[in-house]
Amino acid sequence: VEAVHYGESVDLTSADIVFLGGGPDREQKLASEVLLGMREELRTYVEGDGALLAICGGYQILGSNWLMGDESVEGLSILDLKTVRAGAGFDRLIENIALESELSPQPVVGYENHAGRTKLGASLNPFGKVVSNVGHGNDDDSGCDGTLYRNCIGTYLHGPLLGKNPAIADHLIAAAMERRLGSKVELVALEDEVELAANAYMAKRLGVPGA
């Protein structure tokens, strides 16, 4: 792990996993300005199958824009997605949520809290389909959350996402190792009974079919 402070340059050629989170508007604006200067390096990393997890504001920033209050701020335009203000209905989308995702044999559970409605372009697939009896996803309309492109995951699910969903953590680790080693890897199984039990409890509580 290499610590990088605000204003310092980042060498992504040695990175195995990149995480983009969200935060208060002021701090997110400062971070996005730095990221704009790294746009092509990040694009090369993503297109080269680098493992990347982007949550909430970090997910929005990967698209053409992100929202800061009523202001639309320039995004990285690495992925074909855009975020718009809410129309009629709820202002913020706040709820526990569960998804069906090709990356996990268990439902992907988490917590969403976002005002923006994110629309995917035709070239992108969602990270998962909303299967809980509550939850909104990308836009409260499509029935899907996030996006999955190469080894890049974008999502509105906080949680913590990886602690609640071991299969997603395993996917990112395996993707990073395979890119580094140039060959398929099989991860050594860890004891994750507690995490899976918590996942199953939330899936049942959220009304996931078959849970």
Where are these regions (language model features)?
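Cysteine-nucleophile active-site neighborhood
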Residues: 24-100, 105
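Pocket-forming structural segment of enzyme catalytic cores
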Residues: 71-145
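N-terminal beta1-alpha1 cap of cysteine-dependent amidohydrolase-like domains
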Residues: 1-47, 163-211
